[in-house]
Amino acid sequence: MITAVANETSELKASYNLGYVWLISIVAAMGGLLFGWDWVVIGGAKPFFQRYFELTSEAQIGWANSCALIGCLIGALVAGALSDKFGRKRLLIVAALLFAMTSIGNALASNFAIFIAWRIFGGVAIGLASNLSPMYIAEVAPAHIRGKLVAINQLTIVIGILLAQYINWFLVRNLPAGATDEFIRNSWFGQQGWRWMFGLTAVPSFLFFLGMMLVPESPRWLAKNGKSERARGILARIGGEQYARAAVADIESTLASEEVQHVRFSDLLEPRMRKVLVLGVILAVFQQWCGINVIFNYAEEIFRAAGYDISTVLRNIAWTGSVNLAFTFVALGVVDRGGRRPLMFLGSAGLAAIYILMGFCYHGGVKGLPMLLLVLAAIGCYAMSLAPVAWVVISEIFPNRIRGAAMAVAVSSLWIACFILTYTFPILSAKFGPAGTFWLYAAICVLGFLFIKMNLPETKGKSLEQIERELVD
């Protein structure tokens, strides 16, 4: 059996083809770009398709905004079993095709029912990509840069969000001020503009499809499925023959004590696996329940409560996107140097402190610039910590044999938590006010800090097999 020490030695001696590793990681991270793009494009399109389809009830509008979450949950649930059977690469190719098909389908939708159906199918693509892109990158990346490479997926999500926001703005930049509902419904903006917002998603979707056709299959999936020679060839291209031999031996050693077979979800509840599964699920849920996505999803309401008018709200939203991108770059530079635990501590403690201050500002009637700065601070804190690092950790803590199924459970939990967070914010805000709601999120962040301190080991610089031994054996 190859020991952890031997594995670390092979990591240090390997001469890596970093250009190749970065290339295949960036291609896989295109799934994150499409995830971010598809997630926010509906926000810019809503004022126009709402009038085109003559949606008048809050229930219809809410259904249009949230129906994709059903598909997200479905995609996340099936991703594990299907990727374990058919491979990570093939399922990412399917996700790329789904992104392309659904973007065109939404662009051509002739009625609201068809529009909703395509949105749900688009959610399936998001669920697949959100599960498989970070998993694939984690399985091809050398240990010493795995955190940085997996964090690229978060960077591309942020880039996708920004691209969608700017394309939405560009397409409607000439909309006359004070345009009436009737004018919008009968104008190019109401008839065709929103269709272009969805349809343009097909361009990066086809690029993602072409890129995934050219990258290799995950070597860890190949080794798990009895194709060690193919796995060795891919790993040799990444780090040379010595690295490949040691890596394949290490992968096989972690599988040797267990029969490699179809993984059932009941297998995840085995005593050896249960602890690591609970760890991954709680981290995924905490990434959502830390509250930051409320700021993205309800930015208009939050900024209006802070005293801003609609024109200034749009400017502030652009600032949030820019800060999100800038601090995601910061995360890329520190995730493999600073470690996972310190960044998770920074995110949970930093957000708790910021939310407490936001609560006092709301409670005391403080408006304007102080609130904007606190919101930007919260987004920056999240973007360099919990946003990328949670994805890194849940992509690397699960054992080889159950990684697909366990990732499916964790990512499904994340989407359920996202739905609960998004659904409950208006209810909580109405009952407790903005101040009480953000104080509640601060309390959740404190609990998250304590959970991380007691349960999350440092995974920086360790191979996936070393992490498995520490958490499971």
Where are the model-predicted features located?
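Extended, hydrophobic alpha-helical segments
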Residues: 235-239, 251-252
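Short arginine-rich
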Residues: 241-246, 469-473
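Alpha-helical transmembrane bundle of multi-pass membrane proteins
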Residues: 2-230, 236, 257-473
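Short, well-structured alpha-helical segments
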Residues: 244-256
